[in-house]
């Protein structure tokens, strides 16, 4: 479901603060964030965020195509190791 227009996009206040500080300083360090639910705004384009996936911070470089999506979409939390193979084919 899409968030209603009158509410506007959700962005953590601390995240906005960190992004503004990074823009003002001109440094391009990785900004560590834990807010996977925050929406990517146009002012974040060009910055690199370390999005926490439960184990580590995954670096996400924001580009124009990502605007409007959530940070959590670009930092997978689960790894798929494949389904169990056929025991008959492994035995022979």
From Swiss-Prot:
GO cellular component terms attached to this protein's record: cytoplasm; small ribosomal subunit
Gene3D superfamilies (alphabetical): 30s Ribosomal Protein S19, Chain A (3.30.860.10)
One of the record's GO molecular function terms: rRNA binding
GO terms classed as biological process: ribosomal small subunit assembly; translation
Classification via Pfam families: Ribosomal_S19
Keyword terms, alphabetized: Ribonucleoprotein, Ribosomal protein, RNA-binding, rRNA-binding
InterPro entries: Ribosomal_uS19, Ribosomal_uS19_bac-type, Ribosomal_uS19_CS, Ribosomal_uS19_SF
Function (record text): Protein S19 forms a complex with S13 that binds strongly to the 16S ribosomal RNA.
Family note: Belongs to the universal ribosomal protein uS19 family.
Xref: NCBIfam families: rpsS_bact
Name of the protein: Small ribosomal subunit protein uS19
The organism of origin for this protein: Rhodopseudomonas palustris (strain ATCC BAA-98 / CGA009)
Lineage: Bacteria, Pseudomonadati, Pseudomonadota, Alphaproteobacteria, Hyphomicrobiales
């Amino acid at each position: 479901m899409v968030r209603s227009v009158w509410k506007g996009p959700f962005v953590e206040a601390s995240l906005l603060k960190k992004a503004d500080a990074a823009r003002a300083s001109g440094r391009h360090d990785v900004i560590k964030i834990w807010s996977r639910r925050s929406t990517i705004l146009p002012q974040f384009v060009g910055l690199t965020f370390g999005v926490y996936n439960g184990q580590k911070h995954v670096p996400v470089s924001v580009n124009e195509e990502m605007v409007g999506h959530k940070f959590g979409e670009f930092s997978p939390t689960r790894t798929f190791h494949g389904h169990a193979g056929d025991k008959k084919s492994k035995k022979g």
